[in-house]
Amino acid sequence: NELTGEGKYMDELERVLYNSALTAVSLSGNQYTYQNPLNAEKHNRWEWHGCPCCPPMFLKFTGAFPGFIYSHDTKGIYINLFVGSETQIQLGKGKEIQLKQETEYPWNGTVQLTVSPLKATRFPLRIRIPGWAQGIENPYGLYESDLKDEIKLYVNNQPVNLKIKDGYAEIDRKWY
């Protein structure tokens, strides 16, 4: 999404993460599902496969995953995925921002985000509002849903008027 700033790409990454990548590995970690159980008559997890490409790609994806949580451009920060985490982002000379996310997502939809700039700084913070929470299961029309979640956003315990553009709610303000 760094090329376009559109949240639909992170929606798809999140869908793959929770519905495919993480579910393909057995709890013991030594078996992997190679076929889509929704599209196969019989499915099982294998300990070894003649072409073992999926397990190494899973490890590669797992290693790359933290890099998808946050992104930024020269003006502001994107919160792409909801994961308990901490990071530091340099927006420009003297604009170092510390971010901390606390959440039990996907089991609980509440996310607490702490924004701590080294000094008071104005910048837009763009928080992805997942398509599924807006009733958009898939931006390509592959899935449909009537489900919508109530979306609430607060800054310092004060409600924020949600303006969603390209899948992100933007809060442009001076952060302290």
Q: What is each of the regions a protein language model found here?
A:
Residues 1-141, 164, 170:
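Aromatic (Trp/Tyr) and acidic
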Residues 135-173:
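Solvent-exposed beta-strand/loop surfaces of large extracellular or lumenal domains
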